[in-house]
Amino acid sequence: MIASVLPTYTRAPLAFVRGEGSWLWTADGSRYLDLGAGIAVNALGHAAPDLVATLTEQAGKLWHVSNLYRIPEQERLADMLVAKTFADTVFFTNSGTEACELAVKMVRKHFYDKGQPERTEILTFSGAFHGRSSAAIAAAGTEKMVKGFGPLLPGFVHLPWGDLDAVKAAVTETTAAILIEPIQGEGGIRPAPEGFLRALREICDETGTLLVFDEVQCGVARTGKLFAHEWAGVTPDVMMVAKGIGGGFPLGAVLATEDAASGMIAGTHGSTYGGNPLGCAIGAKMIEIVTAPGFLDEVSRKAGFLRQWLEGLVAAHPDIFEEVRGQGLMLGLRLKLPPGDVVKAAYAQNLLTVPAADNVLRLLPALTISEDDMAEAVRRLDAAAASLETQPA
């Protein structure tokens, strides 16, 4: 008999009833140190007091009214994002997948309205993850995600990760956009190669192609910048955002330049819940907090310590760990054994981590994690690795 919850996840036998900061509790009082943060969602930790206060205050005023009317909370958050990024305009969604759907529509409509309807192709990269909708799985093209789901949305060209020559060869008169994660998350915490994003920007400028960044996982202060592409010194035409922007509340967005968004006039897109007052009030508080003086510097400072300690783990357990990857507090440990084995060994140490492709263990702690909690997490990873080393082959 099928479970009442559709079994599309292989869930761990854990259920949590309370969270605070970087810690989660089960009903029996067991306490777990969380290095996953809901897969980079709980950016300020669990039950962050500022977000709880904002949610409580807004919940007592207004939750939902529909985009048929102006929504002051939505306008405030949009103004904040426009002021702090490349963007001229923002559309709010409830998730990263929804943001991907709009980004695809936006770039294609842009060229249709410019009198170039043949420009529909979008170049993407191996190892990508852009969500689970039909368009998003077509964009990524990963076999395990597309198998069995019938005809996919056409118009995506899949290229080897980081292969600039392949990009140059693939851009044609039918190319609309290049879509890339500045740091692949699900793909194994793989930052774009040095200079790659800048080279893509130059190709797009030369060919009139739009550059789309998926910052759903790597954005919103995760790397020590507000958005990860800032490290490369380039800007996109369109950007997808979600996860951390809501701090745990379902919220996403598409940011765009005026030119890139020029085709999206009234009636071309919509969302019943997207941009609701409750979500946008929380999003505005998130942006206020992570852009406050010193916050991003503190993320980078703590990330430096954590990376150094993880490098020590690699040296101490060469049969388990191969290398440290990533930037800021978006880190990964490439493993010499299946990630699931290490995840389970970490469970035994009451430590939560997240597996990824390319044999990688993701470490995505709350941006507010303390040094003591980071040190404790490394101690527990050390114990997990030691337990695996003592297991019979």
Curated annotation (Swiss-Prot):
Q: Which cofactor does it need?
A: pyridoxal 5'-phosphate
Q: Name one GO cellular component term.
A: cytoplasm
Which GO terms label this protein's molecular function in UniProt?
identical protein binding; N2-acetyl-L-ornithine:2-oxoglutarate 5-aminotransferase activity; pyridoxal phosphate binding
Q: Which Pfam families match?
A: Aminotran_3
Q: Where does this polypeptide localize?
A: Cytoplasm
One BP term from GO: L-arginine biosynthetic process
Positions carrying N6-(pyridoxal phosphate)lysine are: K243
Q: What is its EC number?
A: 2.6.1.11
How many cofactors are bound and how?
A: Binds 1 pyridoxal phosphate per subunit.
- Annotated binding of N(2)-acetyl-L-ornithine, by residue: R132, S271
Q: Which InterPro entries match?
A: AcOrn/SuccOrn_fam, Aminotrans_3, Aminotrans_3_PPA_site, Class-III_PLP-dep_AT, PyrdxlP-dep_Trfase, PyrdxlP-dep_Trfase_major, PyrdxlP-dep_Trfase_small
Transferase is among the record's keywords:
yes
Q: Which PANTHER family match?
A: AMINOTRANSFERASE CLASS III, SUCCINYLORNITHINE TRANSAMINASE
HAMAP family found in the cross-reference section: ArgD_aminotrans_3 (MF_01107)
Q: Which protein family is it in? A: Belongs to the class-III pyridoxal-phosphate-dependent aminotransferase family. ArgD subfamily.
Oligomer status and interactors: Homodimer.
Q: What is this protein called?
A: Acetylornithine aminotransferase
Q: Which organism is it from?
A: Rhodobacter capsulatus (strain ATCC BAA-309 / NBRC 16581 / SB1003)
From the broadest rank down, the organism's phylogenetic lineage runs: Bacteria, Pseudomonadati, Pseudomonadota, Alphaproteobacteria, Rhodobacterales
